[in-house]
């Protein structure tokens, strides 16, 4: 699951991004309302955590404009604790409203609750061939066999399956899964792909994760005659 954090306070933004990543989410963080609105409108997110007091556009404006064409769930996370502000946020279309200071465990519980409520809007089980990824139960299976994945492996597989058939450069994978700039001297992406292949491909046919030399990786079903790696 991919989450956008729109928060102008660096300490809070970094804390949220780190915590959500450790909880198994893919988390992007931006520091102003203009960039936040642009990201929300041009990228695909499962949830947006939005502050109210932001440079550029405030959170009210971001949500109001976003709701003109998008139904992405939004959770306000703000120091504004007035009842009128809470009502305003919910009436503008927010799915929840959390006041700072906040308990991170409770915040994650609220995030998961919102995502569960979104099940009616889109499937939470991704299927490619006999590979299944259940986003709600955080469970992967291949030919009915349960595949045990770490949080990073789950996020990596989710990214590959969500963008089935699309060649993903190493830089994109590093940014989306590890929130890091790709360095050609590091093999973190290649090593993670090898581990993931050992779990979902090595003992099964057809092979699903493929290397496109000089470009990156793609998850797709290929014909038996096509090169697999």
Curated annotation (Swiss-Prot):
InterPro entries in alphabetical order: CheY-like_superfamily, CusR-like, OmpR/PhoB-type_DNA-bd, Sig_transdc_resp-reg_receiver, WalR-like, WH-like_DNA-bd_sf
Function: Member of the two-component regulatory system IrlR/IrlS. May be involved in invasion of eukaryotic cells and heavy-metal resistance.
Annotated gene: irlR
SMART domains: REC, Trans_reg_C
Sample GO molecular function, one term: transcription cis-regulatory region binding
Domain (Response regulatory) ranges: 2-115
DNA-binding region: 123-221
Organism: Burkholderia pseudomallei (strain K96243)
Domain of life where this protein originates: Bacteria
One Pfam family, short name: Response_reg
Identification of the protein by name: Transcriptional activator protein IrlR
GO CC annotations, alphabetized: cytosol; protein-DNA complex
Keywords assigned by UniProt, alphabetized: Activator, Cadmium, DNA-binding, Phosphoprotein, Transcription, Transcription regulation, Two-component regulatory system, Zinc
PROSITE patterns per record: OMPR_PHOB (PS51755), RESPONSE_REGULATORY (PS50110)
Gene Ontology annotations of biological process type: regulation of DNA-templated transcription
